[in-house]
Curated annotation (Swiss-Prot):
Subunit relationships: Homotrimer.
Organism encoding this protein: Acholeplasma laidlawii (strain PG-8A)
Cofactors named for this entry: Mg(2+)
The protein, known as: Bifunctional protein GlmU
Pathway: Nucleotide-sugar biosynthesis; UDP-N-acetyl-alpha-D-glucosamine biosynthesis; N-acetyl-alpha-D-glucosamine 1-phosphate from alpha-D-glucosamine 6-phosphate (route II): step 2/2; Nucleotide-sugar biosynthesis; UDP-N-acetyl-alpha-D-glucosamine biosynthesis; UDP-N-acetyl-alpha-D-glucosamine from N-acetyl-alpha-D-glucosamine 1-phosphate: step 1/1; Bacterial outer membrane biogenesis; LPS lipid A biosynthesis
Molecular functions (GO terms): glucosamine-1-phosphate N-acetyltransferase activity; magnesium ion binding; UDP-N-acetylglucosamine diphosphorylase activity
Functional description taken from the UniProt entry: Catalyzes the last two sequential reactions in the de novo biosynthetic pathway for UDP-N-acetylglucosamine (UDP-GlcNAc). The C-terminal domain catalyzes the transfer of acetyl group from acetyl coenzyme A to glucosamine-1-phosphate (GlcN-1-P) to produce N-acetylglucosamine-1-phosphate (GlcNAc-1-P), which is converted into UDP-GlcNAc by the transfer of uridine 5-monophosphate (from uridine 5-triphosphate), a reaction catalyzed by the N-terminal domain.
Compartments in which it is found: Cytoplasm
Region feature Linker, mapped onto this chain: 229-249
PANTHER family the record matches: BIFUNCTIONAL PROTEIN GLMU (PTHR43584:SF3), NUCLEOTIDYL TRANSFERASE (PTHR43584)
């Protein structure tokens, strides 16, 4: 028998107080629905169906062709959402895993365990439950003396005895397709909200079909994310889980509670990460690197024995033995060579540098190809923008660029060139050249009195 998944993801998420669909909200910079789809893909599920409604094109843009879609134009409850998929799933032999789209921490191994319990016990309808010492806000699982589930009662409808029940409904189910979906049409909406609820299927199925349960051991995996506070709780859980995994694999973290590592980040053993550091995207950090404190790295590669402190690195490569920062900014496919020094308040954009090149402070390198052993003096700028277009700067090997130098692109600087401080260079410089492009200094002795008013003397 095949396994299917049905994710109920049509809601707006009004408690998020945003126009973004709830399931598209980022958790550690990745949309909520991504976590769900990725884990379902890793499980034994063969086909995923998403029920979409509010701003469905946003969710489709995230998931693309990894799922099939059905649409719920009006959001009339979980049962109504499942009805939208019934014409398809009722015809398919097998079982379906049904879950809300706002439970991003569900794990693929848990999904497979749910299927196993469902099949091993011959269940037609398996309700995934959890045990909470404080179950406030959750629907309670009501069982008879034999332990068989009789109904699920929402807290607002529960009596005093039922409110004391600590086993709750997670909103996650495994169902036999033909039996469950054929009965959905019998659901009614005789309730205060006029909505259809999957929980009412217990009443429809308990007489003729087998209802069972699976109690999830880690309640966090079934945590619903309905507001921004819940997003912070989900991020905290994921942060602790991810950081622990890296530390057990040999990554040193100082104050790990202040460090955020994305799901796709690869960090080799022997890396040290200092406080207040965020590493996301498809980033790779190699052994011996030291990152942070106060550093952001996204979609980048940090090679062995690189040090990045108090800096931003986006979509870039930093090669072996280089130091970056403090307060440097690498972006837009910067490729920093081996044993470079990119110092404080230096920005490198869409540029590459060769071995042993240094820009120690207050420099901008943009749209440039820079050779080996180049020294950028303080205040050096590659002037790449003419007001309409960006232009390229090419700098050879063994070039000395004096302080406060402007290189007006497009321009080529040859090998073994020396550029005097304070120059504005507008023409190419050949190999072994010396360039000075500034006005000659004129000094007039005893002349400042004509320009500066004398300060009055203080009275003794």
């Amino acid at each position: 028998m095949k396994n299917y998944a049905l994710v109920l993801a049509a809601g707006k998420g009004t408690r998020m107080k945003s126009d973004i669909p709830k399931v598209a909200f980022p958790i550690l910079r990745k949309p909520m629905i991504e976590y769900i789809v990725e884990n379902i893909e890793k499980s034994s599920v063969e086909e995923i169906y998403l029920v979409l409604g509010y701003k469905r094109e946003v969710v489709e843009g995230i998931v693309k062709d990894r799922a099939k879609y059905v649409y719920q134009e009006e959001q009339l409850g979980t049962g109504h959402a499942a009805m939208m998929a019934a014409p398809v799933l009722s015809k398919l032999d097998g079982n379906t895993f049904i879950m809300p789209g706002d439970v991003p921490l569900i794990w693929y191994k848990s999904i497979d365990r749910m299927f196993a319990v469902h099949e091993d016990n011959g269940n037609d309808f398996t309700i995934v439950t959890a045990h909470y010492e404080d179950p406030e806000g959750y629907g309670r699982i009501v069982r008879n003396e034999q332990g068989v589930i009789q109904r699920i009662v929402e807290e607002k409808d529960a009596n005093d005895f039922e409110k004391e029940i600590k086993e709750v409904n997670t909103g996650i189910y495994i169902v036999n397709n033909k039996k469950f979906f054929s009965l959905l049409k019998n659901l009614n909406n005789n309730n205060a909200k006029g909505e259809y609820y999957i929980t009412d299927m217990v009443e429809l199925m308990k007489k003729d079909y087998k209802i069972g349960s699976y109690m999830i051991k880690n309640n966090s995996l079934a945590m619903g994310v309905n507001d921004l506070y819940a997003i912070s709780k989900a991020e905290k859980y994921l942060r602790e889980y991810i950081n622990k995994d890296h530390m057990l694999n040999g990554v040193s973290m100082i104050n790990p509670e202040t460090i955020t590592i994305g799901h796709n980040v690869i960090i080799e053993p022997g890396v040290t990460i200092n406080p207040n550091t965020t590493i996301t995207g498809d980033t790779v950090i190699k052994a011996g690197a030291i990152v942070g404190p106060n550093t952001e790295i996204h979609n980048s590669r940090i090679d062995s024995h690189v040090v990045v402190r108090h800096s931003l690195v986006y979509d870039s490569i930093v090669r072996e033995g280089t130091t970056v920062g403090p307060f440097a900014h690498l972006r837009d496919h910067a490729d920093i060579g081996t044993h470079n020094r990119i110092g404080n308040f230096v920005e490198v954009k869409k540029s590459s540098t060769g071995h042993n090149t240094k820009a120690s402070h207050l420099a901008y390198i943009g749209d440039s190809v820079v050779g080996e052993s180049v020294n950028f003096g303080c205040g050096s700028v590659t002037v790449n923008y003419d007001g309409k277009l960006k232009h390229k700067t090419e700098i050879g090997d063994n070039v000395f660029i004096g302080c406060n130098t402007n290189l007006i692109a497009p321009i080529k600087i040859g090998d073994n060139v020396f550029i005097a401080a304070g120059s504005t260079v507008t023409k190419d410089i050949p190999d072994n050249g010396f360039a000075i492009a500034r006005s000659r200094q004129v000094t007039k002795e005893d002349y400042s009195k004509y320009l500066i008013s004398p300060k009055p003397k203080k009275e003794e």
